[in-house]
Each structure stands twice: as structure tokens, then as C-alpha cells.
């Protein structure tokens, strides 16, 4: 389904609103997203579980093993999202497939998304100046700071400052402030080609993120975003996003801050399943008196 068609259907769809006005979660989350019609999901919900056309497993909406819609959800009614960057999702082997939102990305942007199950991890050493890992932590930086730094670095292969002694690039936007002031902010940054996302519960991530094959890559954190995932882990900050939320917000930030284009809902359909499931769960909680 084309983006133009999906925008024409936005009046029939669920929608979202900005997360930052302090309103209730439901009001925040059900306004303004330009989504394709979710009628197909509403019909499928009423029918109940259906077979996967590949493995014949009984599933609701989609098969999280085969990454395809179930028989009651016609593929033609599922939006297709084209991304400006390739995405690798590295999934922990103990992550419950049915609880992961990584499958949403593969279903909706299948040409640009590859899912690996750890310890199957590609080699990124020869691509380290073209790849970032979206992962929060003390050494993480914002997307804007990272790409501005690269813009000012010239020939990355010859830039000794970009060869870290501890295998991960170290830099400080504050220390490079004078350099930043000379950057042509109208010039798009085109050398970032791939983004890695870790799909795992937070207590399972340490071994994965420490894997030698992921060393030497800059960690980027989406510091201004808050999660609305219904399975958010207790004890973790609300800025720790679900996988599909992280992908969505990264793409929006890349589009507006790096490509410097007006955002017109190009990636909103990444939340096609997420938004619908959020609404179902919130409605159920309301009915049970838990909201």
C-alpha cells in the first residue's frame, strides 16, 4: 500500500498526539498519527485467532515466527513503510517472540529490516563509520550530536580521534563546540547507512551489547522520548523504549534533524499494530477498572 493511499485513509484510522503535553496516556496516544485504516485489524479481532499461511500456527493478526499476516488479515491491507536507512534487529534467544514488537518492523518495512537471533550477529567492523547502535547508557549520545560530529570529521578513516582506545568512539559535543559552529547545517548527512536495535528485556542485554562484534560502534540514545509500551519493565526509566517505538522515533528524528525535511507522517505506519494493540489493552484495563 502506498504512502499516499495511507494518508488518504488517515480519517478512518486511529491516531496519536504528542507525548509531551502532560495529558493522560490515552489522549496522548490516540491523536495525530497518520495511519492507514485499521478496519482490517478490527475485523480480524472479531474473528479471533487465525492460521499462519506458512506454518499453520494459530495466531492473532500476524505470525511472529514467520513474519507474515495470518489468513484473516489480507496482506494488501497492511501498509508498507519505506525507510531511509537499513535496520538490523538483534533479538535475544530467550526473548518471547509473541511479546516482542520487533516483528512489527519486519511486517511493515520488510525490505529494509533484517532480524537476527543472537548469537547470530553480522560483522560490522568494516562498516563502523556507517552504523550506529540505538542503546541507552552512560556513553550514549544524541543522534544530532553524533552526526554533527561526523560531519565535522572529514575523512573518517584518517581521523585518529575516531579510533578509540577502548574500542568505542569517544567524543564530547561540548568540547567540539567551536567545530560545530562551522558546520553547514543545510547539508544532509548521507553516510549513515544502517541502524542496529537490540530486542531484549533489559536484564538480558548486557552480554549482547558487550559482544565483540558490536564494539567500536557509537551508541545513540533517544533521550527525549517516553515509552507507552504496555509491557514496560519495572525499575527501568520511561525513556527505555520498546523496539518498534525506538525505530519509529529514530526515523522521525533522522528525517527532521539530519535529512532536514518536514515530517509528514512518512513513518507513522510503523506504529500500525502498536497503536491498535495499545488501544485494545487500554480498553480492557478500563473495563476491568484498572485505569
Swiss-Prot record:
InterPro entries in alphabetical order: DTW (IPR005636), tRNA_Mod/Golgi_Maint (IPR051521)
This protein's UniProt keywords: Nucleus, S-adenosyl-L-methionine, Transferase, tRNA processing
Top-level taxon in the UniProt lineage: Eukaryota
GO biological process, one term: tRNA modification
Name listed for the protein in its UniProt record: tRNA-uridine aminocarboxypropyltransferase 1
Keyword tRNA processing (UniProt): yes
Function statement: Catalyzes the formation of 3-(3-amino-3-carboxypropyl)uridine (acp3U) at position 20 in the D-loop of several cytoplasmic tRNAs (acp3U(20)).
PANTHER family, per database record: NATURAL KILLER CELL-SPECIFIC ANTIGEN KLIP1, TRNA-URIDINE AMINOCARBOXYPROPYLTRANSFERASE 1
Enzymatic class: transferase
Compositionally biased region (Basic and acidic residues): 171-181
E.C. numbers: 2.5.1.25
Name of the gene this protein is made from: dtwd1
Residue ranges, annotated region (Disordered): 158-181
GO cellular component, one term: nucleus
Catalytic activity: a uridine in tRNA + S-adenosyl-L-methionine = a 3-[(3S)-3-amino-3-carboxypropyl]uridine in tRNA + S-methyl-5'-thioadenosine + H(+)
A GO MF label: tRNA-uridine aminocarboxypropyltransferase activity
Compartments (UniProt record): Nucleus
UniProt motif (DXTW) ranges: 199-202
Family from the record: Belongs to the TDD superfamily. DTWD1 family.
Amino acid at each position: 500500500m502506498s504512502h499516499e493511499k495511507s494518508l488518504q485513509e488517515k480519517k478512518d484510522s486511529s491516531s496519536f498526539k504528542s507525548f509531551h503535553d502532560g495529558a493522560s496516556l490515552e489522549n496522548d496516544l490516540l491523536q495525530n498519527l497518520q495511519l492507514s485504516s485499521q478496519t482490517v485489524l478490527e475485523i480480524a479481532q472479531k474473528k479471533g485467532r487465525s492460521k499462519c499461511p506458512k506454518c499453520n500456527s494459530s495466531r492473532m493478526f500476524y505470525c511472529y515466527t514467520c513474519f507474515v499476516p495470518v489468513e484473516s488479515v489480507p496482506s494488501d491491507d497492511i501498509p508498507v513503510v519505506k525507510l531511509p536507512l537499513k535496520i538490523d534487529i538483534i533479538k535475544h534467544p530467550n526473548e518471547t517472540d509473541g511479546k516482542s514488537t520487533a516483528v512489527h518492523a519486519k511486517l511493515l518495512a520488510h525490505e529494509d529490516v533484517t532480524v537476527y537471533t543472537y548469537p547470530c550477529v553480522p560483522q560490522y567492523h568494516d562498516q563502523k563509520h556507517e552504523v550506529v547502535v540505538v542503546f541507552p547508557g552512560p556513553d550514549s549520545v544524541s543522534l544530532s550530536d553524533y552526526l554533527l560530529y561526523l560531519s565535522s570529521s572529514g575523512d573518517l578513516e584518517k581521523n585518529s580521534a575516531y579510533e578509540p582506545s577502548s574500542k568505542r568512539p569517544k567524543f564530547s559535543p561540548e568540547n567540539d563546540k567551536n567545530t560545530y559552529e562551522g558546520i553547514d547545517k543545510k547539508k544532509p548527512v548521507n553516510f549513515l547507512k544502517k541502524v542496529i536495535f537490540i530486542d531484549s528485556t533489559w536484564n538480558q542485554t548486557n552480554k549482547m551489547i558487550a559482544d565483540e562484534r558490536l564494539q567500536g560502534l557509537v551508541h545513540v540514545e533517544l533521550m527525549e522520548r517516553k515509552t507507552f509500551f504496555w509491557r514496560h519493565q519495572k525499575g527501568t526509566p520511561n525513556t527505555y523504549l520498546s523496539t518498534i517505538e525506538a525505530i519509529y522515533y529514530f526515523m522521525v528524528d533522522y528525517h527532521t534533524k539530519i535529512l532536514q525535511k518536514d515530517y509528514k507522517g512518512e513513518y507513522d505506519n510503523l506504529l500500525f499494530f502498536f497503536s491498535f494493540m495499545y488501544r485494545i489493552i487500554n480498553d480492557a484495563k478500563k473495563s476491568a477498572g484498572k485505569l
